[in-house]
Amino acid sequence: MRFSLITATLGRVEEVRCLCVSLSKQTFKDFELYIVDQNEHHELEDIVRNFEKNFIIHYIRSDVKGLSYNRNIALRMCKGEIIGFPDDDCYYEVNVLQEVNEAFSSREEVGFCAVTTRDTVTKRVCHISQKAYLYKKDVLKACTSIM
């Protein structure tokens, strides 16, 4: 498995469905998605079932609220070489995983990369002036929290 993606969610249903739709359209298919559901309701279970035929998706219920706590639940289960943390209100352009894979494949020393993002509400784009890489030797120094 190349990528493991972890989304901890609370209070969002339609947004998670949009994320799953975007992942089902990826040009790079070697990934799995973990949905860690902190909601009181069980509406996301049906969404997960609807996407099981498109890609590997794991549904995890959690009664504990908290982003880092719930990401760590899924992190223990991941099989991917590269871990990503898409928010529950984001979606990926069709080639995002392909581009990230190429970034990691082209330079063995790369340990982290970032991509341009767009706020879906304000439509503001956060441009990265150049390819944003963090080398493996610098990852721990640059992180403010470690999971």
Task: Kindly label every feature range from the protein language model.
Residues 20-21, 45, 72, 80, ...:
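Short alpha-helix within the catalytic core of nucleotide-sugar-dependent glycosyltransferases
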